[in-house]
């Protein structure tokens, strides 16, 4: 017989409010509220059991997983300058209902699954800057500095079961609070870069760096330690040369620092151990394009 059951039949209304107050001709104050959702992926909202040969683990779906609903509150000050220069400062607060997290299946570190927790909060501040170097050093032309950085505090209350397991798993000298960081939420983000654009010579050059702080990847339970994603320092180079006849040459280098992507088990008074380690290496690419 045909199965006509839908996985999610709930109708949703997602209101949003935006207020913009012009402080000066080139300065704005923005205040916003919105309700958004983060729905589980097909893999998460299923009964699938998927083997990952890289980590030697099984991902087990959860057919009962619920969407996350997020109340977003934002305030932002922004000032604009010549040639698209920008200085902006923001503060934001998010309240998450039924946040989806990835945790180990009870009494096993070979299986992990998505779970809903009750509530979580996220508070953060953000600085955004786009500045022409020429305004600081007149002898340097066509060079622009871009910077975006965030500092974030997240708080997730333990479920009753998780708190009991973590309490039972306490070691001598170890204490426990009633909350922890939200799984998947980095404590800081940094994206910065230099863009050189010489229109006379039809050359664009970019050097970009981004990194995020140590992030809870898989939630443990006290007996099995939490898994954290370690910071990955990504430095990339990009060069584009335009020629006559709609032709262009592109040269890219990805991961100039040759950093590794790693995740680690971290327990109390224990040396961290690898959960996953991947040497992505440096990637060089050269391309030539003709537009018709």
Per-segment meaning from a language model:
Residues 2-6, 58-63, 110-117, 175-181, ...:
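Extracellular loop and loop/strand-boundary signature of outer-membrane beta-barrel proteins
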Residues 8, 25, 37-96, 106-133, ...:
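Outer-membrane beta-barrel signature, preferentially recognizing the C-terminal barrel domain
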Residues 1, 42-48, 55-56, 99-106, ...:
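Outer-membrane beta-barrel translocator domains and adjoining extracellular loop/strand segments
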Residues 210-219, 240-292:
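C-terminal beta-signal and adjacent terminal beta-strands/loops
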């Amino acid at each position: 017989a045909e199965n006509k059951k839908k996985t999610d039949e709930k109708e949703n209304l997602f209101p949003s409010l935006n207020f913009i107050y012009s402080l000066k001709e080139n300065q704005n104050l923005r205040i916003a509220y919105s309700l958004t959702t983060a729905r589980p992926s097909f893999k998460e909202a299923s009964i699938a059991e998927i083997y990952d040969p890289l980590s030697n683990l099984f991902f087990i779906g959860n057919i009962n997983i619920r969407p996350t609903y997020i109340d977003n509150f934002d305030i932002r000050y922004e000032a604009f300058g010549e040639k698209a220069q920008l200085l902006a400062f923001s503060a934001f607060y998010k309240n998450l209902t039924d946040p989806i997290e990835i945790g180990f299946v009870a009494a096993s570190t070979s299986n992990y699954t998505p779970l809903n927790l009750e509530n979580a909060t996220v508070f953060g501040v953000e600085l955004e800057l786009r500045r022409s170097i020429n305004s600081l050093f007149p002898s340097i032309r066509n060079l622009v500095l871009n910077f975006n950085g965030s500092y974030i505090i997240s708080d997730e209350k333990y479920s009753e079961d998780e708190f009991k397991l973590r309490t039972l798993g306490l070691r001598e000298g170890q204490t426990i609070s009633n909350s922890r960081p939200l799984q998947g939420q980095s404590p800081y983000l940094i994206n910065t870069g230099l863009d050189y654009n010489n229109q006379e010579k039809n050359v664009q050059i970019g050097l970009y760096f981004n990194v995020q702080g140590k992030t809870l990847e898989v939630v443990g339970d006290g007996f099995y330690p939490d898994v954290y994603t370690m910071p990955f320092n990504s430095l990339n180079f990009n060069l584009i040369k335009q020629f006559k006849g709609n032709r262009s040459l592109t040269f890219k280098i990805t991961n100039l620092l040759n950093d590794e992507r790693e995740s680690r088990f971290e327990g109390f008074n224990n040396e961290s151990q690898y959960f996953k380690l991947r040497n992505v290496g440096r990637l060089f690419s050269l391309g030539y394009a003709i537009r018709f």
